[in-house]
């Protein structure tokens, strides 16, 4: 006996209601992208590893621990796409720089990270992604939050919104020094990961999931206290407009996001229906990515949402009313004609089925799940007729073949 081969750890097969939910999420996102004048973009699943090392930051968990990278047969360092923003920016530099800004790009598809599998988190997962590239005015940030909120509302998910600002580059450098001075006092209480972050990027300690570091992080300096007047004014303007639009949110001074390219506004949507891992959607502003890839420096903003986590907390979908026509032939001649009828009905857009190689009794048993059954006997066929049975009521009628299609359409309406 051959050894059973299961799916790869951290992946899963999608079917049934889970797949239906994914298709619904994708359709809602696409409809919103059309309303907000986005261009849909599909980037390759494989990219040069350097693209993500250069743009996500060497201190990010994605680059340090999670990226699936390998050398191809030509010796190039290639990776499976771990996130969308860097890939979308690469596509912008190659294909969209000549277009009037902001360039609005929408993507949906699979991503890959070598993470510890847990509820709502897989090594192959899917995201919906929106990017506004060349979005200078702060109102584009407001639009991003409004779109994100609309997206979650339309798929029936409750959410809470947290915002913060990372300010300009000068702000972040001053703030990093303040964090280093603060966390140095607690070095003996920091995890190995946080000690490494203390050397490379202390902001990432604020994103620590280690319960033993929670109280230390709570007492850390606040980045808004290090903002320039202009950066603080812009953040306050964004908050004022969100209040004007009756969008509830809270300012979270420890929110930093997990990737190093963010600057300015950052935001995260969480769900009260999830546990400790409650983030549903996140994003923020960035300005260095395009320049890092040989393009011009452009202020941009974007967000992404993990589909698997959304699927887990979406409301149960209403049952689909699949209206199916079953065909049950009786006799060898009827069997051949029933096959012709089966493919004819399908070509006319009806959902039709016929079980091959079964007895009449077994076929009728299978047909109980259908809306309508067409019973085709040899004697009836010789008269140019079939029996049509409505399965819910058991009502039967004899229908001439030339009227069969129109009768079935009426019964399936």
Curated annotation (Swiss-Prot):
HAMAP family: His_tRNA_synth. It comes from Neorickettsia sennetsu (strain ATCC VR-367 / Miyayama) (Ehrlichia sennetsu). This is Histidine--tRNA ligase. It is found in: Cytoplasm. SUPFAM superfamilies: Class II aaRS ABD-related, Class II aaRS and biotin synthetases. Pfam families: HGTP_anticodon, tRNA-synt_His. The keyword GTP-binding does not apply. It is an enzyme of class 6 (ligase). GO terms for cellular component: cytoplasm.
């Amino acid at each position: 006996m051959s050894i059973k081969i299961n799916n790869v750890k951290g992946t899963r097969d999608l079917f049934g209601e889970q797949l239906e939910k994914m298709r619904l999420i994708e359709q809602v996102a696409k409809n919103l992208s059309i309303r907000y004048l986005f261009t849909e973009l599909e980037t390759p699943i494989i990219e040069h590893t350097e693209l993500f090392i250069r743009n996500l930051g060497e201190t990010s968990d994605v680059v340090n621990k999670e990226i699936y990278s390998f050398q191809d047969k030509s010796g190039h360092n290639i990776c499976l796409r771990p996130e969308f923003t860097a890939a979308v920016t690469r596509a912008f530099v190659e294909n969209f720089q000549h277009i009037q800004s902001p360039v609005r790009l929408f993507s949906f598809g699979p991503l890959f990270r070598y993470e510890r599998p847990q509820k709502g988190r897989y090594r192959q997962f899917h995201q919906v992604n929106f990017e506004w590239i060349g979005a200078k005015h702060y109102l584009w940030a407001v639009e991003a939050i409004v779109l994100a909120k609309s997206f979650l509302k339309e798929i029936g998910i409750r959410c809470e919104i947290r915002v913060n600002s990372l300010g300009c580059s000068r702000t972040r450098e001053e703030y990093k020094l303040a964090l280093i001075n603060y966390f140095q006092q607690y070095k003996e209480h920091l995890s190995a990961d946080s000690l490494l972050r203390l050397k490379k990027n202390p902001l990432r300690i604020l994103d620590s999931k280690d319960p033993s570091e929670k109280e230390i992080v709570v007492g850390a300096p606040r980045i808004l206290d290090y903002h320039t007047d202009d950066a603080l004014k812009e953040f306050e303007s964004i908050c004022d407009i969100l209040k004007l639009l009756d969008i509830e949110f809270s300012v979270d001074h420890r929110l930093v996001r997990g990737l190093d390219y963010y600057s300015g506004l950052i935001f995260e949507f969480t769900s009260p229906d999830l546990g400790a891992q409650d983030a549903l959607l996140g994003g923020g502003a960035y300005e260095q990515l395009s320049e890092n890839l040989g393009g011009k420096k452009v202020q941009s903003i974007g967000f992404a949402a993990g589909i698997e986590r959304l699927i887990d907390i979406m409301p149960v979908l209403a049952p689909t009313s699949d209206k199916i026509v079953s065909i049950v032939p009786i006799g060898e001649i009827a069997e051949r004609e029933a096959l012709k009828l089966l493919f004819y009905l399908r070509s006319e857009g009806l959902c039709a089925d016929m079980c091959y190689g079964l007895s009449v009794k077994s076929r009728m048993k299978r047909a109980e799940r259908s809306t309508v059954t067409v019973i085709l006997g040899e004697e009836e066929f010789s008269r140019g007729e079939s029996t049509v049975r409505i399965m819910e009521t058991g009502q039967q009628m004899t229908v001439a073949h030339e009227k069969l299609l129109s009768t079935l359409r009426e019964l399936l309406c």
